[in-house]
Amino acid sequence: MKRMILLSMAMVMSMTMLFAQSREGLTEYKLDNGLTVMLWEDHDQPDVTGYVAVRAGAMDEPAEYTGLAHYLEHMLFKGTQKIGALDWEKEKPFYEEIIRLYDEYAETTDEAKRAELTKKINEASIEAAKYSTVEDFFVLLDGIGATGVNAYTSYDMTCYHNSFPATNMYKWLTIFSDRLIDPVFRTFQAELENVFEEYNMYQDDVMTHVRHNLYSKLYAGHPY
């Protein structure tokens, strides 16, 4: 137990030192829309590393929908009404029908009814897919020279990040603002499998279990 306490203290101290170091040269801006922008310039580097962090994560999930924050992280890679849309006006009715069917699914506990709704969702999803592609977001980022495109979800933060040439700053901002302002949750059902695969992968990781056990003791009765 003593060893665990010392380890935890060492982790906190190293994180504090890292934060203190990173404050040097950091400029913070507050935009009119409430968004906070932090800029740390390094003119020795040709690329920009951009992070968009949202102060929301697993601790904000409803108790009956655990994993929702991580799932939302995945869905924000599926495009918008512009990105990934081959014909949004034709896709839109099917997309709205899928949302309506999911709402109906959530309101019933009858298994036969749920099976029927799942079938209808599948059919509507197949039709919607005829007018869209989920690869456009990655294609656009690749086109501006982006690398390391990824995201992660923690207990109280969701972060989307990648690097890109400084000359393409405006294009990167345009792509990222569109994904956050006007997302379309395409391939909603299929993406569930990817999320479950990630979950199962981490279940085989020893440190995942160590962290969960530690947090259950440190944050008993808390969403952490």
Question: Which residues are covered by each model-predicted region?
Answer:
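Sec-dependent signal peptide recognition
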Residues: 2-10, 14
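Short acidic/His-enriched helical or mixed secondary-structure segments at domain edges of catalytic enzymes
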Residues: 194-213
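Gly-rich Lys/Arg/Thr-decorated short loops/hinges at beta-loop-alpha junctions or inter-strand turns
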Residues: 219-224
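Catalytic zinc-binding patch centered on the HExxH motif and its immediate surroundings
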Residues: 30-32, 39-41, 144-154
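Short, glycine-/polar-rich solvent-exposed loops and beta-turns at beta-strand/coil boundaries
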Residues: 65, 152-155, 191, 206
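His/Glu-rich zincin catalytic helix
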Residues: 5-7, 18-134, 159-166, 170-177, ...
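Acidic/histidine-enriched alpha-helical segments
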Residues: 89-92, 184-200
